[in-house]
Amino acid sequence: MNLALDEAKLAFSKKEVPVGAVLVKDDVVISHSYNQSISKKDPSAHAEMNVLREAAKKIDNYRLNGASLYVTLEPCLMCFGACIHARIDRLIFAAEDQKSGVVINNLNLQDESFFNHKISVSRGSLATESSVLLKKFFQERRN
């Protein structure tokens, strides 16, 4: 989660929404990234999506069985859906997203039985640090 937070800080320095993600498989970091929607002018360039795309290219397969995704913010609907399609095993997030998060907030999708793949979800460390960084970013944007 520390590497994911480092990615979020990098996003912050580039005036992107400070969310970072890291994908690990067999105790090896396969990919890491941060939100790049603003710079890429791409609404799908969330940290999670960037990490999943990069990992799929590296292992030459979009199925990421056995992988764990660490992310500094609870995923949105798009990102959680991509995690299911990628067949990751574990999702560990730091801060809850009460506005757009769908894993435990709003839609609470982690408990839905209609998905063809079940992801083990847990809250990781650094929730406070991740939340503080996000709040600082949006406060600066408003001023």
Model regions: which residues?
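Short beta-strand scaffold segments in enzyme catalytic cores
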Residues: V19-D27
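Helix-adjacent hinge/juxtasegments
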Residues: K41, A45, M49-A82
